[in-house]
Amino acid sequence: RDTRVSSDMLALSLAAGVAAGGGNVLDGGVLPTAAVAFFVRRAGADFGVVVSASHNPPEFNGLKVFGADGCKLSEKMEERAERCFDEYAFAPPLACGRCRPLAKRGKYADFLVSCCERPLSGKKFVLDCANGAAGRIAPRVFRRLGAEVVALHCAADGRTVNDKCGALHPESMRAAVLATGADAGFCYDGDADRLIAADERGETVDGDKILCIFAKHLQAAGRLPQNLAVGTSHTNTGAERELNAHGIRLFR
């Protein structure tokens, strides 16, 4: 879950319902959305659920559900779940399940550090954590990699998630990059599944530009064997043309 006031209540209600139905729950506490996908596979769970409204204001909330493979449920599976609520009478469980805490942040931080191919010593980064889940993970990971970190908006009071900060409001991050002479800056949203970056000049680097940077880097390193990048329906034609100019196809 993220840091919203309502997230604890919804998460506890969800856990109670699962346990009452005979299921067992591992409660990860406040974690980025990607961490839940990671732990679903690591723990061999049947499902994972994130309580968050992502980049929306703090008064909103919702659920994101992952399957056993760590991927979001398909539309077909979501429709099937909805039909279950409408069509089936639920039998009483044979036994009540348990809810216990998931030993988490350290292992997830270890995983993220292991993904970095080179240390970040001598680099300075501004991290805007949107007063959300990234605040407990991102600064720690960057510092472990040797970087100097300027951390913004890491409060966890539950009432200021995404409030004039984070990925939808990168202005303070960009200003901090210029003021501190940082090499780059990164803005997350409340559940850390959205990212906006800035370069050393404070210029915004959005998702399309990040996709192009990653794809061209992997191609140059010989790690893009099919010369294919995957975007979304929102990926703009400018990004597609840039990729095509380097012999990379875009699949939406």
Each language-model region and where it sits:
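Gly/Ser/Thr-enriched, mixed-charge loops and adjacent short helices
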Residues: 61-180
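N-terminal small/polar loop signature for handling phosphorylated ligands or for N-terminal nucleophile
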Residues: 2-60, 140-198
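Proline/glycine-rich low-complexity loops and linkers
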Residues: 19, 28, 79-110, 114, ...
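Short glycine-rich phosphate-binding loop at a beta-alpha junction
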Residues: 1-3, 26, 124-127, 227-233
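Alpha-helix capping and helix-loop boundary segments enriched in small/acidic/polar residues
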Residues: 5, 129, 160-165, 202-206, ...
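Structured core elements
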Residues: 50, 64, 126, 187, ...
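Short beta-strand-to-turn element immediately C-terminal to the catalytic PLP-Schiff-base lysine
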Residues: 65-68, 196-200, 244
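Short, surface-exposed alpha-helical segments at coil->helix boundaries
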Residues: 7-12, 78, 135-139, 240
